[in-house]
Curated annotation (Swiss-Prot):
Keyword Membrane on entry: yes
Subcellular location: Cell membrane
Any GO CC annotation of this UniProt entry: plasma membrane
Bilayer-crossing regions: 23-43, 70-90, 111-131, 135-155, 159-179, 182-202
Name this protein carries in UniProt: Bacitracin transport permease protein BCRB
Membrane topology: Multi-pass membrane protein
Source lineage: Bacteria, Bacillati, Bacillota, Bacilli, Bacillales
Pfam family, one: ABC2_membrane_4
Gene name per UniProt: bcrB
Record's function text: Part of the binding-protein-dependent transport system for bacitracin that confer resistance to this antibiotic; probably responsible for the translocation of the substrate across the membrane.
Species whose genome carries this gene: Bacillus licheniformis
Record GO biological process: response to antibiotic
Keywords linked to the UniProt accession: Antibiotic resistance, Cell membrane, Membrane, Transmembrane, Transmembrane helix, Transport
Amino acid sequence: MAKKAKYPDVPIRFSETFSDTNLYIVLLIGVPLYGVITSYLFNREYAESTLKNLLTIPVSRISLIVSKLVLLLIWIMMLTLIAWVLTLLFGLIGQFEGLSSAVLIEGFKQFMIGGALLFFLVSPIIFVTLLFKNYVPTIIFTIIISMVSIMVYGTEYSALFPWSAVWVIASGTFFPEYPPEYSFISVAATTVLGLAATIVYFKKIDIH
């Protein structure tokens, strides 16, 4: 909308709007926002001192983590869908050009891929939350992640940094210096390591 107001003679296309919005979500907004939700979900029992009581019920620690991950997935994908719908509505209100079923499907696909991959990458954020049992370190950690993602954006190194690799994968903008497999491996390795660290730490930690 701002671009259209500044350059009224330059048409704004839906494809660019979907792509730019998803870029902002993946690199700038998504990680801190989902980090806050993650921190709340996994730190709430610590903050309210109810985790020990919760674990007295026949619920394993792994089951507790899985249930919270399912809830987190629902939150992330729901917010991603809302962002896609709002982008479409703003485009219709602003009378952007180039709307077609192909553009809608491609935009929806990019949003969903970005949301799903960001969900996978919350595992290190969960570990930081459990480690410090406080919201502040988690928020700082996610802000640092976003800053690094923005710093490497547009360079070939964005294909290697897990959180910026999400955008590379979702948009299909791979770099000739690094095959697509590098981006997938970066995301997968970070996810697995973060999840493993979370499970091992949560199983061994003493609950007071």
